[in-house]
Amino acid sequence: KTSTRTRCAFEVAARDQGAGVTYLEPSASQIGHKESIKDTARVLGRMFDGIEYRGFGQDVVEELAKYAGVPVFNGLTNEFHPTQMLADGLTMREHSDKPLNQIAFAYVGDARYNMANSLLVLAAKLGMDVRISAPKSLWPSENIIEMVQAVAKETGGRILLTENVQEAVKGVDFIHTDVWVSMGEPKEAWQERIDLLKDYRVTPELMAAAENPQVKFMHCLPAFHNRETKVGEWIYETFGLNGVEVTEEVFESEASIVFDQA
């Protein structure tokens, strides 16, 4: 997958530590096209000390890790976004005077993919209080839920899944969301997703429902919060929405810490 923040973060971090970086563009690489993942992993593992992979399938990054013989970092797959969790956990700690295991946060929106899954894992491992709010058809898979519940039993983490968004955000310190249509999905998905998620937009009213004047808004970006992009304008012209998963008022408010996070 293409990338702005993730690629830049890896490259800046590597160069700050004196490491060299080679970027293989999706269109220029033969991975999975003319050369198998297994073969590619064994070649790259002989040339590099580490590999960051950003793509669609979790199975691909796991196969790279199996055969490369060097550390492989998951820069994002459809299922997980672990490096973003380093940023999210740090950002929540920086913007709270509570220890991590006393922080409560909610994720609202489409909860089937990498951000909701990864936030569940983060909360379970660190003993945090996480609430996932989405229509039941957009909840994480049963396998993910069972996995994080088992981990949370060991750490004291608290996990709630609910369709009631007001219940989810009450008393939280942070409200997270993400885009409703992910990279690679067809335009036709927008209508269905908007119909399902219209009550899960992060608005000033939803922020107020936290009943916490210090509540912060988080989003891994990019966000559809106004009409200032081609996609944002198309959404406005097609569906009449100026901003999708979050309103401009919340995104640009003092409660928004998205640029610290991203």
UniProtKB/Swiss-Prot annotation:
Source organism of this protein record: Neisseria flavescens
Primary location: cytoplasm
Name the UniProt record assigns to this protein: Ornithine carbamoyltransferase
Gene (name only): argF
UniProt enzyme class: transferase
Keyword Amino-acid biosynthesis recorded: yes
This enzyme's EC code(s): 2.1.3.3
Pathway: Amino-acid biosynthesis; L-arginine biosynthesis; L-arginine from L-ornithine and carbamoyl phosphate: step 1/3
Statement: the UniProt record of this protein carries the keyword Signal: no
Site positions (Important for structural integrity): E94
One Pfam family in the UniProt entry: OTCace_N
General function of this protein: Reversibly catalyzes the transfer of the carbamoyl group from carbamoyl phosphate (CP) to the N(epsilon) atom of ornithine (ORN) to produce L-citrulline.
